[in-house]
Amino acid sequence: MAKNLIPSDVQLEITQIKSAIGGKQNQRDTLRSLGLKRIGHTVVRTADAVTVGMLNTVPHLVKVEEAK
């Protein structure tokens, strides 16, 4: 779902599913900015333009679902 996101007022559950070790520095910084610290860690963020842009940077490291 991370590739088809558009900015809106929807709440997103973002879960880190892969490690940032060996990744580029900007990808590690993006995960930290999203509030993700370890594999399996989940945060809830609004799908604003900033968050969608960050998710488009690391789609291979996170799983995105609509929050319930």
UniProtKB/Swiss-Prot annotation:
Q: Which SUPFAM superfamilies match?
A: Ribosomal protein L30p/L7e
Matching InterPro entries: Ribo_uL30_ferredoxin-like_sf, Ribosomal_uL30_bac-type, Ribosomal_uL30_CS, Ribosomal_uL30_ferredoxin-like
For this UniProt record, the keywords arranged alphabetically read as follows:
Ribonucleoprotein, Ribosomal protein
Keyword Glycosyltransferase among UniProt keywords:
no
User: Which Pfam families does this one have?
Assistant: Ribosomal_L30 (PF00327)
> Gene Ontology cellular component?
cytosolic large ribosomal subunit
The protein's superkingdom reads Bacteria
- Keyword Zinc-finger assigned to the entry: answer is no
Q: Name one GO molecular function term.
A: structural constituent of ribosome
Example GO biological process term? Answer: translation
Gene3D superfamilies referenced in this protein's UniProt entry, alphabetically: Ribosomal protein L30, ferredoxin-like fold domain (3.30.1390.20)
What are the disulphide bonds in this sequence? none
Subunit description: Part of the 50S ribosomal subunit.
Question: Member of which family?
Answer: Belongs to the universal ribosomal protein uL30 family.
Report what the protein is called. Answer: Large ribosomal subunit protein uL30
* Source organism of this protein record: Arthrobacter sp. (strain FB24)
What is the primary gene name for this protein? rpmD
